[in-house]
Design a protein with these regions (language model features):
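Short terminal alpha-helical segments
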Residues: 1-38
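A structural signal for well-ordered alpha-helices, especially hydrophobic packing surfaces
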Residues: 19, 23-33, 57-60, 64, ...
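Heptad-repeat coiled-coil alpha-helices
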Residues: 28-31, 35-38, 42, 62, ...
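Amphipathic protein-protein interaction modules
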Residues: 44-86
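Amphipathic alpha-helical binding modules
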Residues: 71-108
């Protein structure tokens, strides 16, 4: 198998895994928002966060479509992925806030 074919297969595999991870965390973020009380995140912030998660999932779907439509291996720029990474970090932050809130609620 030529090296460029192997590199293309590796790139496809890595991107598929990365996009699946983004999907997982964006879905997890939506689930967390549904159980998030107002004392942790007010309704306006929850709505805005949820909208950004939906937009990011649409971007991931569009990226997948472009990758599948291409006859050549393609990469995704860091400029495109940076906002997704930031959003995943926000999901982790929300998970931490909810855990602290749950702990506080059980202690009071």
């Amino acid at each position: 198998m030529p090296a460029d074919v192997e590199a293309g297969d590796l790139l496809e595999s890595l991107l598929a895994s990365l996009l699946a991870d983004f999907d997982h965390w964006f879905s997890r973020g939506q689930a967390l928002l549904k159980q998030c009380p107002d004392r942790v995140l007010n309704p306006d912030h929850r709505k805005e966060f949820a909208e950004r998660l939906v937009d990011a999932q649409r971007s991931i779907a569009a990226t997948r479509s472009l990758l599948q439509a291409s006859s050549q291996p393609m990469a995704v720029s860091m400029a495109a992925m940076n906002p997704w990474h930031g959003l995943v970090t926000e999901v982790w932050g929300l998970a931490a806030k909810l855990a602290v809130d749950r702990r506080h609620q059980t202690l009071t």
